[in-house]
C-alpha cells in the first residue's frame, strides 16, 4: 500500500459553505470544523447527561454485559431524553447541518442514527485502524466511488491532544478498496480545541489514540453518527415519547425519525410516511418554533 503524504487535516470556520466542505471531504475523507459549539453548551450537555435520571451509561446496560468496554472509558447514549441541550442546541446546530448537507448532497435527507457521549481516562488503550460503517453490513458492497451513506461527527468537549488520545486518521484512505494493514506513519493526528468538530467519511481509515498518563485529566467527546434517511436508525424513534418530541423543533424532530424525510429522485413520496403523506400531518404533530434560518421542515 502506498504511503500517503503527511498533509494535515484541513480546518474550516463554522460558517463555511457546503461546496467548500464537500470538496474537502471528497478529497481527504476528513475535515475539522472549528468552534461548532460553545463552552457553555458543552458544560450544560455534560451536566445534564451525568445527572440524568434516564438510563444512559452503556456499561450499566445488562444486555451489554458481555461487551468488552475498556475500564478507563465510559459511554452514554439515550441522549435525546437525557439532555435538553442535546435536543435544542446540538440537533439544531447550523454547522452540523451544513456539514451533513455537504456529505449527503447526492442522496437527500439524513437523520441521526445514534449519539454517544464518551469519556476516557489515562490508560484507555488505542484503537486499531478501522472504518465506521460496521452497523450497516450492506455498505461493504459499495464501491469507493459511491456517495457516502453515513458520517461520523466527533465534537470535542475537552481539548484533544496526542497525549490524551487524539484520533489518528489517514487522509485519502476513503478511496482505498480495503482497510488492509495501515502503518502509523501513514496517519496524522486530529488535535482539537474544545468545541471543534471532526468530520469522518464512512470509509475513512482511522483509530482513536491512547489516553496516556501524561494527560491526567478526563477527556470528553460527543460522537454523532448520521446516515442517509434511506438507512434505519440504530436508536428507534419509538423509544421517544410524543410529549417529549413535541417540545422539539421540526428540524430536530426530523433528526430523530418523527417526520417524513425526502431522499433524491426517483422517490417522490418520501420515506417514513403516513398513508403516503407527511407523517407529521397524519399524526397532527406539534413542534417548537423553528430557530431563525430554519424552514420548519
From Swiss-Prot:
Keyword set for this entry?
Dioxygenase, Iron, Metal-binding, Oxidoreductase
Query: So what EC number does this one have?
Result: 1.14.-.-
Q: Which GO terms describe its molecular function?
A: dioxygenase activity; metal ion binding
What is a single Pfam family found in this protein's UniProt entry? PhyH
Tell me which cofactor or cofactors this protein depends on: Fe cation
Q: Which GO BP terms sit in this record? A: terpenoid biosynthetic process
> Under which pathway is this protein filed?
Secondary metabolite biosynthesis; terpenoid biosynthesis
Q: Which InterPro entries match?
A: Phytyl_CoA_dOase-like (IPR008775)
EC class, as a word, reads oxidoreductase
Any keyword Mitochondrion?
A: no
Residues given in the record as Fe cation binding sites: 130, 132, 206
What is the role of the protein in this entry? Iron/alpha-ketoglutarate-dependent dioxygenase; part of the gene cluster that mediates the biosynthesis of calidodehydroaustin, a fungal meroterpenoid. The first step of the pathway is the synthesis of 3,5-dimethylorsellinic acid by the polyketide synthase ausA. 3,5-dimethylorsellinic acid is then prenylated by the polyprenyl transferase ausN. Further epoxidation by the FAD-dependent monooxygenase ausM and cyclization by the probable terpene cyclase ausL lead to the formation of protoaustinoid A.
State how it assembles: Homodimer.
Remaining remarks: In A.calidoustus, the austinoid gene cluster lies on a contiguous DNA region, while clusters from E.nidulans and P.brasilianum are split in their respective genomes. Genetic rearrangements provoked variability among the clusters and E.nidulans produces the least number of austionoid derivatives with the end products austinol and dehydroaustinol, while P.brasilianum can produce until acetoxydehydroaustin, and A.calidoustus produces the highest number of identified derivatives.
Family per UniProt? Answer: Belongs to the PhyH family.
What's this protein's name? Iron/alpha-ketoglutarate-dependent dioxygenase ausU
Q: Which organism is it from?
A: Aspergillus calidoustus
Amino acid at each position: 500500500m502506498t504511503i500517503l503524504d503527511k498533509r494535515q487535516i484541513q480546518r474550516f470556520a463554522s460558517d463555511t459553505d457546503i461546496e467548500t466542505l464537500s470538496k474537502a471531504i471528497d478529497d481527504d475523507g476528513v475535515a475539522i470544523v472549528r468552534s461548532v459549539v460553545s463552552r457553555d453548551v458543552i458544560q450544560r450537555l455534560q451536566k445534564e447527561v451525568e445527572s440524568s435520571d434516564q438510563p444512559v451509561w452503556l456499561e450499566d446496560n445488562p444486555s451489554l454485559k458481555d461487551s468488552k468496554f475498556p475500564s478507563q472509558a465510559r459511554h452514554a447514549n439515550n441522549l435525546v431524553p437525557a439532555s435538553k441541550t442535546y435536543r435544542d442546541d446540538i440537533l439544531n446546530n447550523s454547522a452540523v447541518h451544513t456539514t451533513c448537507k455537504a456529505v449527503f448532497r447526492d442522496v437527500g435527507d439524513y437523520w441521526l442514527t445514534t449519539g454517544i457521549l464518551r469519556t476516557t481516562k489515562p490508560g484507555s488503550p488505542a484503537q486499531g485502524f478501522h472504518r465506521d460503517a460496521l452497523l450497516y453490513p450492506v455498505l461493504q458492497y459499495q464501491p469507493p466511488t459511491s456517495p457516502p451513506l453515513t458520517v461520523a461527527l466527533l465534537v470535542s468537549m475537552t481539548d484533544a491532544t496526542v497525549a490524551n488520545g487524539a484520533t489518528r486518521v489517514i487522509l485519502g484512505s476513503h478511496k482505498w478498496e480495503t482497510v488492509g494493514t495501515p502503518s502509523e506513519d501513514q496517519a496524522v493526528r486530529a488535535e482539537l480545541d474544545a468545541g471543534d468538530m471532526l468530520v469522518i467519511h464512512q470509509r475513512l481509515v482511522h483509530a482513536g489514540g491512547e489516553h496516556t498518563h501524561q494527560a491526567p485529566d478526563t477527556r470528553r467527546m460527543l460522537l454523532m453518527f448520521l446516515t442517509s434517511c434511506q438507512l434505519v436508525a440504530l436508536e428507534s424513534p419509538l423509544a421517544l415519547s410524543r410529549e417529549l418530541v413535541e417540545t422539539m423543533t421540526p428540524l430536530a424532530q426530523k433528526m430523530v425519525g418523527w417526520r417524513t424525510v425526502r431522499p433524491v429522485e426517483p422517490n417522490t413520496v418520501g420515506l417514513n410516511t403516513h398513508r403516503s403523506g407527511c407523517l407529521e400531518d397524519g399524526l397532527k404533530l406539534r413542534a417548537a418554533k423553528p430557530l431563525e434560518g430554519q424552514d420548519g421542515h
